[in-house]
Amino acid sequence: NKGLKSYKERKIKSIFLGKVENPVQFNNRAKLNWSDVIDLFEMPISQGYPVAKYKYTQDEYLELVSQSLFGLCLPGYGPKCNREIELLGLGVVPIFTPGVDNTYYEPLIENKHYIKVNSPEEVKNKLDTINKNKWEEMSNNCISWYNRNCSPKGSFDLTIKIINNI
């Protein structure tokens, strides 16, 4: 896990950095108020033109995410998003919300790779039950899953495995 931050080095408990660019995203992301329960929550809304510019470069975005323990996953234009893969690869434990599709060839397992909440009201209690040791275990599970499924070598090996099983 070279280059990944330890528990102590992560200064952000929970994060969501995303935006709303169309009515579908607005409907999926703005129904509930997640900003009160996520420590660093940024979701500028611009439906139509001009589209809001990203506040952060890709490197700045990934640096902020890498400083986080947990990352909120909200559905966007569709049920799948790159955000989950970014979180898993950086060892950030995803917080899945209703409408997020987390089905993969190798299934993610609740309370092993991610936590699930149905509403903002559940977030604090769920996060408070995860101590340093449990978070480290979950974070390592996330990184291992990413390496097996999404890293260049892992995704190649997985593709070969799937083809061989056809």
Give the predicted meaning of each segment:
Residues 62, 95, 120-123, 142:
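Catalytic phosphate/metal-binding cores of nucleic-acid and nucleotide-processing enzymes, i.e., regions
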Residues 125-145:
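Conserved donor-nucleotide binding/catalytic region of nucleotide-linked donor-dependent transferases
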Residues 113-120, 129-130:
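Conserved acidic donor-binding segment of nucleotide-sugar-dependent glycosyltransferases
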Residues 1-110, 116, 148-162, 166:
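Nucleotide-sugar donor-binding catalytic core of glycosyltransferases
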Residues 81, 111, 120-124, 139:
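Short amphipathic alpha-helical surface patches that serve as generic macromolecular interface elements
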Residues 58, 120-123, 132-135, 152:
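Residues at or immediately preceding the N-termini of alpha-helices
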Residues 122-126, 141, 154-162:
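Alpha-helical elements of Rossmann-like donor-binding domains used by nucleotide-donor carbohydrate transfer enzymes
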